Curated annotation (Swiss-Prot):
Family as reported in the entry's similarity comment: Belongs to the terpene synthase family. Tpsa subfamily.
The reaction(s) this protein catalyses: (2E,6E)-farnesyl diphosphate = viridiflorene + diphosphate
Cofactor binding summary note: Binds 3 Mg(2+) ions per subunit.
Name of the coding gene: TPS32
Species of the source: Solanum lycopersicum
Chain positions recorded as Mg(2+) 2 binding sites: 301, 305
Listed name of the protein: Viridiflorene synthase
Residues reported in the UniProt entry to bind Mg(2+) 1: 301, 305
Highest taxon of source: Eukaryota
Length: 548
């Protein structure tokens, strides 16, 4: 934020955010209706063939064959077409095999992970048969690479106190790392990829794009599934490009790049974020709403963090609390731009949702916006006063400024099934939401520590922890990483049955956690600096189609 010098002149920092990587690339997109219709017709035929595959598997195949088919359909991004059919199959599997009698590591690991991901509270003890008297996994398993790979993936759905799964992670990781250089493709690629990014913590759409290319190399692939996946991917990508074009034009019309040059220009990255929350076609409205909100809160964040002075920010904060366009007259010229855009955006949401009689839920998102702005102002005052709070005080404020209370609430606006009761549940900050917010906060703090330190920020989470406990930077970062791992266990626990809300609602929270794991990979801030982390994903998901 800006400071006053000894002559009471405002000294504003020169914005050093890199420009958008994309320019006008996504501003216009013309849908080829002929190609889209052709794809859609083929997809309908392939969908029925896949439905038959699932029906046949449900009636007359082995447990391993059932699980493998479900796993492939999910990884290829096709499961949204067959949700009830897959749920019925899994319920059948769960009831038919209550003692988990599969004897091979591969099948049991696959069974455990898939059932856990669908909310079944399966005990970790089913893996004890693969351990010796000392609780160590038997070395005889070290040659079962597929089994180890599925054990590794299964270990990432662990919750608190699951020591067997902790041991499973360590054991499988060590042996997969040792084996990886000696494996043949496509298994070698799968192992290397998994060690870099576990399936459970990855963005589903990113994994779909990756797995289609891997599945194509498989010797015993199903050509119906492969073609279905490619066509479905490309058709859905057309919809995503249309939505991104809408968001990009909205962003360009606001002209923040010119009027607010201190702020990050990240509309494309904002849209990518929403694809992580929900990629399926029925969430089109939700994606556009969420992308615009992320872009808007980024502007507000940078206004507090990189430009405004305390007196300006105090008025700005108060104006947003009052949420009235008449407050604009109190603001300096540059703040009027974002203030009006903010109020206009939420008014648009109300108009849009009124068509379905749901405009009242926008108020929940407004309250979260007011909350985050209040907390941004607290951080601004800490900065100007040179105040370093105890880490507990820091976190109580910084959880809101992570943006995840706001973004989770906003993610439900365009979800037609989200009821007022769902928003009320979320407004009470349930444990799974608190975990998600904590995850976002501590991972962000690790990734942005050096940059914030360079900008003179002293009230960072890492600095506060170091001061409170008299420890080194590395020890503080290790502690924050430990907090992230605890948060992930809370998230995993929160999706297990019985649940207070629907799976559709909980999946948004899980997916928001996954976005953090991908965006901040290797402690990099992929949103602010998308060149290394997000650019390859954006090209794969929004530029390059799959060759049919």
């Amino acid at each position: 934020m800006a400071l006053l010098n000894n002559q009471d002149e405002i000294v504003r920092p020169v914005a050093n955010f890199s420009p958008s990587l994309w320019g006008d690339r996504f501003h216009s997109f013309s849908l080829d209706n002929q190609v889209a219709d052709k794809y859609a017709q083929q997809i309908e035929t392939l969908k029925e063939q896949t439905r038959s595959l699932l029906s046949d598997a449900a009636c007359g195949t082995t447990l391993a064959e059932k699980l493998n088919l479900i796993d492939i359909v999910e990884r290829l991004g096709l499961a949204y077409h067959f949700e009830k059919q897959i749920e019925d199959m899994l319920d059948q599997i769960y009831k038919a095999d209550p003692n988990f009698e599969a004897h091979d590591l591969n099948t049991l690991s696959l069974q455990f992970r898939i059932l856990r991901q669908h909310g079944y509270n399966i005990s970790q003890k089913i893996f004890s048969r693969f351990q010796d008297a000392n609780g160590k996994f038997k070395e005889s398993l070290s040659n079962d690479i597929k089994g180890l790979l599925n054990l590794y993936e299964a270990s990432h759905v662990r919750t608190h106190g699951e020591d067997i799964l902790e041991e499973a992670l360590a054991f499988s990781t060590a042996h997969l790392e040792s084996a990886a250089p000696h494996l043949k493709s496509p298994l070698s690629k799968q192992v290397t990829h998994a060690l870099e990014q576990s399936l459970h913590k990855s963005i589903p759409r990113v994994e779909t794009r990756y797995f289609i290319s891997i599945y194509e190399e498989e010797e015993f692939k199903n050509d119906v599934l492969l073609r279905f996946a490619k066509l479905d991917y490309n058709l859905l990508q057309m919809l995503h490009k249309q939505e991104l074009s809408e968001v990009s034009r909205w962003w360009k019309d606001l002209d923040f790049v010119t009027t607010l040059p201190y702020a990050r220009d990240r509309a494309v990255e904002c849209y990518f974020w929403t694809m992580g929350v929900y990629a399926e076609p029925q969430y089109s409205q939700a994606r556009v709403m969420l992308a615009k909100t992320i872009a808007m809160i980024s502007i507000v964040d940078d206004t507090f963090d990189a430009y405004g002075i305390v007196k300006e920010l105090e008025v700005y904060t108060d104006a947003i609390q009052r949420w009235d366009i008449s407050q604009m007259d109190r603001l300096p010229e540059y703040m009027k731009v974002s203030f009006k855009a903010l109020l206009d955006l939420y008014e648009d949401y109300e108009k849009e949702l009124s068509k379905d009689g749901r405009s009242d839920v926008v108020q929940y998102a407004k309250e979260r916006m007011k909350e985050i702005v209040r907390n941004y102002f607290v951080e601004a005052k800490w900065f100007i006063e040179g105040y370093m709070p105890p880490v507990s005080e820091y976190l109580s404020n910084a959880l809101a400024t992570s943006t995840y209370y706001l973004l989770t609430t906003t993610s439900y606006l365009g979800v037609k099934s989200a009821t007022k009761e769902d928003f009320e549940w979320l407004a009470k900050n349930p444990k799974i939401l608190e975990a998600n917010v904590t995850l976002c906060r501590v991972v962000d703090d690790i990734a942005t520590y050096e940059v914030e330190k360079g900008r003179g920020q002293i009230a960072t989470g890492i600095e506060c922890y170091m001061r409170d406990y008299g420890v080194s930077t590395q020890v503080a970062m290790d502690k924050f990483q430990e907090m992230a791992e605890i948060a992930w266990k809370d998230v995993n626990e929160g999706i297990l049955r019985p649940t207070p809300v629907s799976t559709e609602i909980l999946t948004r929270i899980l997916n928001l956690a996954r976005i953090i794991d991908v965006t901040y990979k290797h402690n990099q801030d992929g949103y602010t600096h998308p060149e290394k982390v997000l650019k390859p994903h954006i090209i794969a998901l929004l530029v390059d189609s799959i060759e049919i």
